[in-house]
Design a protein with these regions (language model features):
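Structural signature of WD-repeat beta-propellers
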Residues: 91-92, 130-131, 170-171, 215-216, ...
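Bacterial Sec signal peptide processing site at the extreme N-terminus
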Residues: 27-49
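Extracytoplasmic beta-rich repeat domains
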Residues: 31-35, 55-81, 105-123, 145-162, ...
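Short loop/turn segments that connect beta-strands within beta-propeller blades
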Residues: 100-103, 139-142, 179-183, 224-228, ...
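Sec-dependent bacterial lipoprotein signal peptides
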Residues: 1-27
């Protein structure tokens, strides 16, 4: 009896070659435009969407206008603060004002000393900082001084206000908690500063009994509000340049906390997203920005240091 042995490898190759030739010859006789692998009711994902007409014109009415030519805002830290129906503004020359946001009528206006940071408002108080390191709290109703506390350092960013505390971040990298009613220092934390930093600072953010703050060393820190105990921290980016100038990784923008995530950005670094539950970074994209990320309708946007805009879905 004779046995026949088939070369399996060669047999499979011949079958594959035959199938390829058959398919090519079959396709050449077909109308490729009519060849579809989806039903008529389904959407072809590769087909460009049709352009739709839309109107970009909106009618905006000017209810009221107030001009202020006092002081400068080079660092962009003199921004208005809203609370109830009032708008609070301050400038570097020391003018602090309370304005009715509906009518534009000035409720009260006072002259303070030269200021280094703008207004923060909440829980009945209004807080500013002057060039001598004094943190000053005013009564929101009439502008009367409630207390003044010297923190022995320049404060360049508006404070964060809670029912019990006023949280300050100084230009020297120190995070301070002052009693909201008396201005007494309750606790402090000092971060490690690099040798070279950008003049500017980010404001702390208070969410659910925790403080979120970005530092000049390019790190995000999370602290317990009542005690100042560090809960966790993470690097927004790492210094990697060959010189101190190219290694600047200052984070001069406030973190944004939303949906269990913390969105952060820094200069010559990253747009970085941290997960609150995991206490770690879960997504990064190379970026260089002085501004806080913007999250709106499922879109993440960041304004770059060169004024370009990046968006992510």
């Amino acid at each position: 009896m004779k046995y026949f042995q088939i070369n399996t490898y060669k047999f499979k190759n011949n079958i594959s070659l035959f199938l390829i030739i058959f398919l090519i010859s079959s396709c050449s006789s077909m109308d490729m435009d009519s060849l579809k692998f989806w039903e008529d009711g389904e959407v072809d994902l590769e087909e460009p969407k049709k352009l739709e007409n839309f109107s970009s014109n909106y009618a905006i009415s000017n209810n009221w206008k107030i001009s202020s030519n006092n002081g400068e805002n080079i660092l962009g830290n003199f921004i208005p603060s809203f609370n109830a129906n009032n708008l609070f503004i301050a400038d570097s020359s020391g003018v602090v004002s309370s304005i009715n946001s509906l009518s534009g009528q000035i409720n009260w206006e006072i002259q303070s000393t030269f200021l280094s940071s703008g207004v923060a408002s909440g829980f009945g108080v209004l807080v500013v900082s002057d060039v001598d390191g004094n943190v000053i709290a005013y009564n929101q109703d009439d502008g009367s001084v409630l207390w003044s506390s010297n923190v022995k350092a320049e404060v360049l960013a508006p404070a964060a206000i809670d029912a019990k505390f006023v949280i300050i971040k100084t230009g020297s990298g120190e995070l301070l908690a002052l009693d909201k009613n008396s201005g007494e220092l309750k606790w402090s934390y000092r971060s490690k500063l690099p040798n070279l930093t950008i003049r500017g600072s980010s404001s702390p953010v208070i969410v659910d009994g925790q403080i979120f703050v970005s530092f000049d060393n390019g790190r995000l820190g999370v602290f317990e509000l009542d005690s100042g105990f560090p809960i966790w921290d993470g690097a927004i980016s790492y210094a990697s340049g060959p010189s101190e100038l190219e290694s600047l990784v200052d984070s001069d923008s406030s973190p944004v906390v939303e949906g269990g995530l913390v969105y952060t950005a820094n200069y010559q670094g990253n747009l970085n997203i941290f997960d609150l539950a995991q206490k770690r970074s879960v997504w990064t994209s190379e970026s260089s920005s002085f501004f806080s990320p913007i999250i709106i309708k499922g879109v993440l946007a960041i304004i770059e240091a060169d004024s370009s805009i990046k968006t992510f879905s």
